[in-house]
Amino acid sequence: YVPIDEEGEAASKTLEYAFDDWTIARMAQAMGKGDIAATFDKRAANWRNAFDKDTGFMRARKRDGSFRTPFDPSASGYGTDYTEGNAWQYSWYVPQDVAGLAAAHGGSDKLLARLDEVFNAKVDPSIFEHMEDITGLIGWYAHGNEPSHHVAYLYSYAGQPWRTQARLKQIMDTQYADRPDGLAGNDDVGQMSAWYVFTALGFYPVAPGSGEYILGRPFLPKTAMRLPNGKTCLLYTSDAADEEDS
């Protein structure tokens, strides 16, 4: 893990480096370099070093192994424990091991309850006035900043895909509009737009590098995707607009 007494934003860096290591492992595996893949797969589990089982949040540790105190999961600030966010927003950043994250929380039911806490919280946006990167709030979920973008899809991993579908519609309805201020935040490397495109199609790469996509719900009646091999993939759906999710 990255020690907070030696480097700022240590909690989020620990989580992001773990995911980076996992993607390196996938590349090494594809290249037939099993020894390298095994090394980086082990490093990819370092997210566990940031998890505090007593609070259920990802936290920054000091070099001596203790968590930094005092701890306020709602606190945010540049150069603190997290990059452009807080514990509520970063504690779900384990896209490479959602099953492990659920187990760390005590099982899928516990994970579902924590996800509900994220989206249903009553949060005053003014607490982020000093952080222009944290925008597009739905509870603690911040759609205007990319680290939160996979969170709505985690309901599906926990066995309730209809909850993912309902959250996706909520986000699409409230965070995008065809006007000059129609994006909830900066379109960093195109991610705000990419989330919209993938979600509108009906699937999303929660763990980029895996080659896997989690199903959501399509928002378009028909889509044609031209593939690199020259073929066209056609997606059809019915009742894609405003029907009750089920």
How would you name each of these model-derived features?
Residues Y1-F219, T223-K231:
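Active-site core of glycosidic bond-cleaving carbohydrate-active enzymes
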Residues Y236, A240-S246:
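Single conserved hydrophobic/aromatic residue that forms the stacking wall/gate
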